[in-house]
Amino acid sequence: MKHEIMWWMSRLTIMITSIFLSMTLAAQAYAAEIQMGKDGMLVFAPCELTVAVGESVTFVNNELPPHNVMFAGHDELSHNDLAFSPGESWEVTFEKAGDYEFQCDPHAGAGMKGVIHVK
């Protein structure tokens, strides 16, 4: 009987620990990343993304530089400096809900555009 109680107690401890860990991981902030250039193409990947107010998106220069990120009507979010080095990145934090269209100025004509939906 004592052995059976110990067995159940150990199972209960494992279950409670697992639930606690999963809740802790779920509460961590979501970190989104958009690649600038992918598979030899002049694209943002992904080109459409949804995040919550207060969350950040990191833009990472992946290939085929130079790239920048310009948000239509939101100069405060734009990054006009060109990224030349692979892995070069910058982060944008969205404080207000809305749809934020962006493009890479040197490659907008090639369709390097995207949108971030902030809910």
Positions of the model-derived regions?
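Extracytoplasmic copper-binding redox domains, predominantly the cupredoxin/blue-copper superfamily
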Residues: 2-10, 22-119
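Sec-dependent signal peptide recognition
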Residues: 10-18
